[in-house]
């Protein structure tokens, strides 16, 4: 059995760690609320933009644009959105597992656009070519950052470096649930159903379509960045909460061991005293 001194030292260490994980949980909870608000605000905008784009594409069926044109697929691009830091449970692991499954099932050459250090570092050790990297986006992704990623990907697509592009990210479901998701980004698919809402376009539907298509790509990237950040904070809050609870249980077990060690020491001391007294008789 460990000595009482060793057990006390372990209790202090676990208690210090518990304070850290508790603080990290509170910080993650605060950031989660802000990230969740942004996700909720971004989703309707993305849906409405998609609806307008669908109406335009339907009304201007003869309009050709590089982002709408399908071509024979040889190289597929995966934009994988992971975190820059760890301590967020299975957030990165689950997404990378889904990405690996998609790569294994893919019949074409796959190239990665890594967003976040965790994904970048993981695939640097593998055999999948990473053609672009974006790290250090912080806890508050901006539209400017999303635009930079989108323009890079659009350039790769229009140059023929990529023939299809997919976004792989964690969709935010709730604070305790994140869903690894894959959606097609390029070429932009025309929705099968559109609303009956009538739109009046100025100066012309064709000019607006040309402007909206890149904007749509930027918006989708921005939305998925926000989804990923909210998911990351939810996963981190859950992980740190579990770590705090585990620390509490460990302290309780160590305290019980300490009490037993004290009791054993007292019993031994009493036995020695009684034994010494008996020897003097």
UniProtKB/Swiss-Prot annotation:
Superkingdom of origin organism: Bacteria
What do the Gene Ontology cellular component annotations say? Answer: plasma membrane; proton-transporting ATP synthase complex
A single Gene Ontology MF term assigned here is:
proton-transporting ATP synthase activity, rotational mechanism
Membrane topology value: Peripheral membrane protein
Q: Name one GO biological process term.
A: proton motive force-driven plasma membrane ATP synthesis
A family per Pfam: ATP-synt
> Where is this protein localized, as stated in its record?
Cell membrane
**What InterPro entries does the entry give?**
ATP_synth_F1_ATPase_gsu, ATP_synth_F1_gsu, ATP_synth_F1_gsu_CS
Q: Which UniProt keywords apply?
A: ATP synthesis, Cell membrane, CF(1), Hydrogen ion transport, Ion transport, Membrane, Transport
Q: Which NCBIfam families match?
A: ATPsyn_F1gamma
Q: To which protein family does this belong? A: Belongs to the ATPase gamma chain family.
Record HAMAP family? ATP_synth_gamma_bact (MF_00815)
Q: What does the subunit comment say?
A: F-type ATPases have 2 components, CF(1) - the catalytic core - and CF(0) - the membrane proton channel. CF(1) has five subunits: alpha(3), beta(3), gamma(1), delta(1), epsilon(1). CF(0) has three main subunits: a, b and c.
Q: What does this protein do?
A: Produces ATP from ADP in the presence of a proton gradient across the membrane. The gamma chain is believed to be important in regulating ATPase activity and the flow of protons through the CF(0) complex.
Q: What is this protein called?
A: ATP synthase gamma chain
Q: Which organism is it from?
A: Desulfitobacterium hafniense (strain DSM 10664 / DCB-2)
């Amino acid at each position: 059995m460990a000595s009482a001194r060793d057990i006390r030292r372990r209790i202090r260490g676990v208690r210090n760690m518990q304070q850290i994980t508790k603080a990290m949980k509170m910080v993650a909870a605060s950031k989660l609320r802000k990230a969740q608000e942004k996700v909720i605000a971004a989703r309707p905008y993305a849906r409405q933009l998609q609806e307008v784009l669908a109406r335009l594409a339907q009304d201007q069926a003869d309009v050709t644009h590089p982002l709408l044109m399908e071509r024979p697929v040889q190289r597929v691009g995966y934009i994988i959105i992971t975190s820059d830091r760890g301590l967020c449970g299975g957030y990165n692991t689950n997404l990378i597992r889904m990405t690996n499954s998609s790569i294994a099932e893919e019949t074409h050459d796959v190239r990665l656009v890594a967003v976040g250090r965790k994904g970048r570092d993981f695939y640097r050790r593998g055999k999948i070519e990473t053609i672009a990297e974006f790290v250090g986006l912080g806890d508050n992704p901006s539209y400017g950052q999303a635009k930079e990623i989108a323009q890079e990907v659009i350039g790769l697509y229009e140059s023929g470096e990529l023939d299809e592009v997919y976004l792989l990210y964690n969709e935010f479901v709730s604070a305790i649930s994140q869903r690894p998701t894959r959606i097609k980004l390029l070429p932009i698919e025309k929705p099968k159903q559109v609303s009956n809402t009538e739109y009046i376009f100025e100066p012309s539907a064709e000019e607006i379509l040309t402007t909206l298509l890149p904007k749509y790509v930027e918006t989708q990237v921005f939305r998925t960045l926000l989804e990923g950040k909210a998911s990351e904070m939810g996963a981190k809050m859950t992980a740190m909460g579990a770590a705090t609870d585990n620390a509490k249980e460990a302290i309780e077990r160590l305290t019980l061991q300490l009490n037993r060690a004290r009791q054993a020491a007292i019993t031994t001391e009493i036995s020695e005293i009684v034994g010494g007294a008996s020897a003097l008789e």
